[in-house]
From Swiss-Prot:
Source species taxonomy: Eukaryota, Metazoa, Chordata, Craniata, Vertebrata
Annotated effect of mutating residue 52 to A: Impairs F(1)F(o)-ATP synthase-binding
Annotated keywords: Coiled coil, Mitochondrion, Transit peptide
Residue range covered by the transit peptide: 1-25
Residue numbers spanned by region N-terminal inhibitory region: 26-52
Source organism of this protein record: Bos taurus (Bovine)
Role this protein plays: Endogenous F(1)F(o)-ATPase inhibitor limiting ATP depletion when the mitochondrial membrane potential falls below a threshold and the F(1)F(o)-ATP synthase starts hydrolyzing ATP to pump protons out of the mitochondrial matrix. Required to avoid the consumption of cellular ATP when the F(1)F(o)-ATP synthase enzyme acts as an ATP hydrolase. Indirectly acts as a regulator of heme synthesis in erythroid tissues: regulates heme synthesis by modulating the mitochondrial pH and redox potential, allowing FECH to efficiently catalyze the incorporation of iron into protoporphyrin IX to produce heme.
Superkingdom, taxonomy of origin: Eukaryota
Annotated effect of mutating residue 51 to A: No effect on F(1)F(o)-ATP synthase-binding
Site feature: Participates in pH sensing: 51, 74
Effect ascribed to mutating residue 57 to A: No effect on F(1)F(o)-ATP synthase-binding
Descriptive protein name: ATPase inhibitor, mitochondrial
Positions carrying N6-succinyllysine: 103
Region entry Disordered, spans: 26-52
Length: 109
C-alpha cells in the first residue's frame, strides 16, 4: 500500500512539473495576457509621462537628423548641378567658337 501511495505522489510531482513547464515561468505572455502588460507607459503616472517624453525626444532628434541629412543631400545635388551647368556653358561657348571659325574660313574662301 505504501508503494502505491509513493508511486501516486511521484506521478503527481512529475505531472506538476510538466504543467509548470507547459504554462511557463515568469511574466511570459499567455493567451489571456496582453502583450504590453507591464509596460511603463501604459501604467500612466509620472513614469508613463517620463517614458512618453523620452520617446518624443528620441523621435524629434531622429527627425532632426533626417532633415539635416536631407538638407545636405540637396545642397550636394545643387552643387553638382551648378558644376554641370558651368561645364555645359563652357561646352556651348567652345562650339560657338568653332562655328565662328568655320564662318570666318568660309568667308575667306
Amino acid at each position: 500500500m505504501a508503494a502505491t501511495a509513493l508511486a501516486a505522489r511521484t506521478r503527481q510531482a512529475v505531472w506538476s512539473v510538466w504543467a509548470m513547464q507547459g504554462r511557463g515561468f515568469g511574466s511570459e505572455s499567455g493567451d489571456n495576457v496582453r502583450s504590453s502588460a507591464g509596460a511603463v507607459r501604459d501604467a500612466g503616472g509620472a513614469f508613463g509621462k517620463r517614458e512618453q517624453a523620452e520617446e518624443e525626444r528620441y523621435f524629434r532628434a531622429r527627425a532632426k537628423e533626417q532633415l539635416a541629412a536631407l538638407k545636405k543631400h540637396h545642397e550636394n545635388e545643387i552643387s553638382h548641378h551648378a558644376k554641370e551647368i558651368e561645364r555645359l556653358q563652357k561646352e556651348i561657348e567652345r562650339h560657338k567658337q568653332s562655328i565662328k571659325k568655320l564662318k570666318q574660313s568660309e568667308d575667306d574662301d
